[in-house]
Amino acid sequence: MNSKKDKKKSKTTTKQTHLTTTYKGVLDIAKSGMGFIIVQGLEQDILVFPTDFNTALKGDEVRVKITKIRQGSGKKEGKVMEIVKRKQVSFSGTMQIMQHHAFFLPNTIHPMPDIYIPMDKLKGAKTGDKVIVQLTKWENSNKKPEGEVLEIFTPEKENDMAMKSIVAESGFPLVFDGEVLAFAKTLSDKISPDEIVKRKDYRKVLTFTIDPLDAKDFDDAISFQHLDNGHIEIGVHIADVSHFVQPGTAVDKAAYERATSVYLPDRVYPMLPERISNELCSLRPKEEKLTFSATFEVDATGKIVHTWYGKTVIFSDRRFTYEDVQTIIETKEGDHQDEILWLHDYTQNLRKKRFENGAINFSSQEVRFTLDANGKPIGITVKESKASHQLIEELMLKANQLIAEKMGNVKVKKEVLPFPYRVHDQPNEDKLNPFVVFAKKHGYPFNIDSPDHIAHSFNNLMLASKGKPEQHVLEQLGIRTMAKAVYTTNNIGHYGLGFEHYCHFTSPIRRYPDVLVHRIVQSVLMGNVMNDEGLEEKCTHCSMRERAAMEAERAANKYKQVEFMRDYLGHSFEGIISGVASFGFFVETVEHKCEGLVTIASLSKFDDFRLIEADYALVGSRSGRKFNMGDKVVVKVAAANLDKRQLDFEWEVNGMLNKKD
């Protein structure tokens, strides 16, 4: 009975316990077609065969039933029982049209069925056309999914299709449905006297906005007034989105689904319809607007001696751009110069104290694109954080902190009020240790004895490396050691900012958590405290949508960088090695911040290179030549693949060749 056959059979014996267990998770699909359900809290993913997807697609939130538990490994196999929420309903791809029927072939590297398109839903699409299609029906996996053409792209719309594809792949709807737009149209822009008497009136207090030159929505304004006691009151006034977006309405559901606006180089996919974001809630100059405000009274020493929170009505006297305010700060001249200069001094002091108290001063670089009429990039610059940006940043941080502190002290039946905090955990030790070794090799001491020591070490390192070749690499590696900031009702503080209490209150036009915060704060002020039992689930959803938006924004930036570099094929650039791996090293160009890969294969003509992980370096086995993180190199643009959003570089051993000015 101990035959090899019996032994083999015993290894695959299925444990038949707990097979009624179901889990909720997210479906990931490998290139092979196999599925894996990622469940929060489970150490191992649940394996699902393609025949058990039950119409689920990559990224869908699903409910899965366990069908088998493998003996020995304990690995679970399952079957999708229900699709809780589809990640993506719009897809980019190509049309294939027959005599009596048509199919849409999705542009994806992951296995996905073709979508049947009824002939009356083609909207004029022809075979070979690049289109966006919306999934409208898929009753069961024995039938083809059904959809309709949303948009047809001509060659000159290549950029438009790419941006829409990125947004759709990230699970964000491309348009608002008719019900949402119709609801938004019904909202009145008239402010009634009855509404004004319910609010604190700031219409006669000096108020202004400071925003980018091309901003279309202004969701925050600052007021400034001298009080009779000699103190100064600063008001942070935020568009009162929750007044217009009531829970359970069509527009609220659409906003929650998105949870955030998505900002791409040439467009914005807003969380709210433009009727709300760009009109009703935009704090435009010379218009009365409804706001939700946090004000703080500051004495002669800069100490906050009193705070107030509540609904207000304002009248913005002036719209400043960041450039306007920066000019006033530098020249000491301009409209409302006294107020601007006082706020500049005050916020620089806030900033200084914040870093002294443990905040970390990472200065990540943000690229900006100059685009032609068709959306093609013709220039890339790096956005600078100047004093004018810091003025607004510090006031917003202070308002968010004060609101969170206030709500942290509210009790409901002797229990802490559930509240959507913005939290940031301490660095991961496994990620931190290699970074510390790398920093010390470059001559930068690093103390990891406590969280405070870590924060101060990061700040000292950033200061000491400023202007040096390795600065950007150290910043990027340092950021990678950090945990991701998330929304949760479990307040563990915000390590990166050095705050014990923090939330997002100041951008409800573009972030749904801010809407949740406004509603809860108002319920506390009204004495009818909102205790949302589903709040943690909403926090998790908002965190996931935020990550998806960031991935879309990174993908769009990468697309634009690759598109820009197509015009520079064969040209050489100075760069900094920004990453090393067994398959090559990544280089970021100094001039344009475009990152590409120098493959190990392209280096083989020089030497046989191997990765030394502890050194973050590739080392030649014969020559000993090292490519270290942070090294300056010269690279030639070898390939620019728009479909994959990838740049290939080749190392230039002899320096700058064919450099294009």
Task: Describe the predicted segments one by one.
Residues 1-233, 242-288, 617-623, 628:
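Charge-lined substrate channels and their catalytic hotspots, especially those that engage the 3′ end
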